[in-house]
C-alpha cells in the first residue's frame, strides 16, 4: 500500500509497523495503546447536550412502551445499507450520528431472512406489510427461511416441533458475526476495497464449487463497501479515507456497524473490541491539545447512546426465546495482551462510566475480559459499577487468551472469536433433559406421545436402573447429535445463499476460521435427574398407554451447584460425551465444532416443551438458565455454586459456559469498599478455578417484586440474565417470575 497524504495525516504520531502496509489492527493496537493503571478520578460527568439527548431517548422509550412495544415501523422498504435517508435525534447536539431508518426508534423491515417473519412482526404490533413487498419476496425473491424449510427432513421438523431441538436460526437472522468495524476508521473504505479486489484477482482459477462461491461472496463484499461509502455521504462524511482524529474514528467505526445492522437483523449483532482501539485516537488528541477529557467522554456517551437504541422488528415467537428486546451489541473491554501487559485504558473506564452518565441499560452488552492481572483500580471500578447497576458481565480472559490471542471479542453472550479472522454458524441448542425422557420412553415424546426419536422398547422396570437408563441415553444422544448437526448444515447453507452478511464479511479477512456453534440446554436438569436415578430411588409413573409421564422419588440425592463431585462429575461427563458425538458429524464448510452451555431466556420455553423429569422438576417448569444449578438447589452458598459451574470444561465448550449469579448486597459486606473488594476477590477466585463467564446481579428480591407492580417507577432497572442484560420491565410476567424464583445468595 502506498501511503497517500490522507494516510500520512491520519496516522501522524502513531508508531509504524506491518499495519501501515497490510490490514493488521491488532499490531496497530499493541504498538500504540497506553496502559492506564490509575483510578476513576479523571472521569467527567454528562454535558448538557448529553442530558438533553438522553431525555429525548427516554421520552421515545416511554412512547414506545405506551404503543405496545413498537414506536413506528417500516412496512414497505426492504432495509439495506442505503435504503433510508439520514436520520437524527437532534442534528445540532449529536456528536455521533446515524440511525437505522430515517427516524430514531422506527424499526426497519428486513425480509431476506424470511418474509413470513417480517409479516408476522408487522402484524404482532398492528401494522400491515405492504402487499407488493410481500409478493416480491414470496413469488420472485426466495428467502433464507423458505430455503431451510424446503430442505428440512420430516425427522428435523418433528424434532423442531417437539422441542428437543429448538431456537434454531431458521426463522430469524443467525447473527453472531462480528465485523472488524475498526478497519474502516484505521484504513478508510477505499483501501479495504483495494484489498478485496486484490484477493479476488489472485484466487485460484480452478473453478470448483468452493471457488465459485467465494468469488461471488467477494464481489458482494466489494459492493457492500461501495454502499458503505454512500451511507457515509448521506451523513456528510467521506469515509473512503482513514479517520484523522478521535471524533472521526468513533463516527467511522459506528457507520460501519450501522451499515451492518441496516442490512442484517441477526439475533446478536455484536460490536467487537473497540474501546482500547479508540483510546489510541483519544490519547493522541488529548496529548496534542486538540480535545478535552469532557469532550472525549461526551463523544463516548453519544456513541453508547446510539448503541442503546439499536432496534429490530421481531416476531412473538422470537421474543419468547430472547425476551426483552435484546440486540447483543456486545463490547469487550480490558483483557491482557499475550506479552503480559493489561489492555486497560482510560476508555475502558469511559465506556463503563456511561452507566453513570446515562444511567443503567442492557445495551451495549458491556463485557469485561477479566484477568487476575488486570490493574487493581480497574477491578475495583468494575465491581463498583456492577454493584451499582447490575449491567456488566465478566468473561475469563486468562482462559480464552490461550485459544484466541489478545484481539478477540465476544459475540452475543459468551462466544469468543478472533476479530476479523473468525466467524461462527450459530446453532441454538439441543435439549438434553428431554433427550433423557426420550431414552426412558423409547424415543416417544412424553408430552404428545408421538414417536420422534428412534423407536425401541421403553424402560419397563418399576424402579429406574442407572446403567440401563444411561445405556439408552447414550444411544439417544448419538441420534440427537446427528439430526442436530444435519439441521444446522441446512440452515447455514441457506443463510449463506439467501441472506449473506456481505458487509460484516467484507470486514473480515478473505480466508477465515468458521465454527459450528452448537449448544445444550437442560444440563442441570439432566445431571440432577441422573443423580436421582443413581443415588435415590426413582419410580416411573406411566399413563394408560404405558408412557412414562411422571416420577416418584424416594430418598435424597446430590444436586449440582453444591460443589459435590458425585453430581458435578455427571454434568462434566454429559458435556464431554455430547461434544464427542457432535464431532463425529461432518459440518457445513468444514467448520470446527464448538458448543455452549447457554439458554438466553429460552430456559422458560424449554421448560414448557419438557415434561416431568426424574429430578422432581414438574412439567412446564423453567430450566435453569445456561450452566446454572436449578433454582434453589444450590444451598451451600455462593462459592460452592460457583465451584460447581467452574468444573464444566471450557476445552469442549468453547462457545461459552454461561453462569448467571445473583447476590444480595449485604452478603458482600456492610461498607462500599468491602463490597468492592469482596466482589473482585470472588471474580479472581472464579477465574483461577477456570470458570468462564459470570453475569452478576446485586440487588434484593423485593426490588424486583416492586418493579413488577410499579414498572413506571423502574424505566432503567437492568438485570443480567443468561448471557445478556435486559430492562426488567420488558420481560413477560412469566419470565419476571422465573428471575425472581432463582437463588439470591445471602452468604458467600
From Swiss-Prot:
Classification of source organism: Bacteria, Bacillati, Bacillota, Bacilli, Bacillales
Family under the similarity heading: Belongs to the glycyl radical enzyme (GRE) family. PFL subfamily.
Keyword check for Cytoplasm: yes
GO biological process, one term: glucose metabolic process
Pfam families linked: Gly_radical (PF01228), PFL-like (PF02901)
CDD domains linked to this entry: PFL1 (cd01678)
The name this protein goes by in its record: Formate acetyltransferase
Domain PFL as annotated: residue spans: 5-618
UniProt gene name: pflB
Active site, per annotation: 412-413
Localization per Swiss-Prot or TrEMBL: Cytoplasm
Molecular function GO labels: formate C-acetyltransferase activity
Region forming the signal peptide: none
EC number: 2.3.1.54
Record's function text: Catalyzes the conversion of pyruvate to formate and acetyl-CoA.
First-tier enzyme category under EC: transferase
